[in-house]
Amino acid sequence: MDVEISTEFIKLDALLKFAALVGTGGEAKYVIAEGLVEVNGEVCTMRGKKLHTGDTVTFAGQTVKITR
């Protein structure tokens, strides 16, 4: 699935909520801290990681690509 952003970047925890992959910010924080989220194919535990156009995020079998 593609997620279009209108800003230069979106933070990882915000993307998970925006794409409806998690229900709350607390849930986003938990799944990121547990190493359940991949950014560009690598596990990422930084919830404030800035994602830019072209980045991909995978969680729970779903992949999201950032577009602009």
Where in this protein do the model-derived segments appear?
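A basic, amphipathic helix-loop patch mediating RNA/tRNA/ribosome contacts
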Residues: 7-50
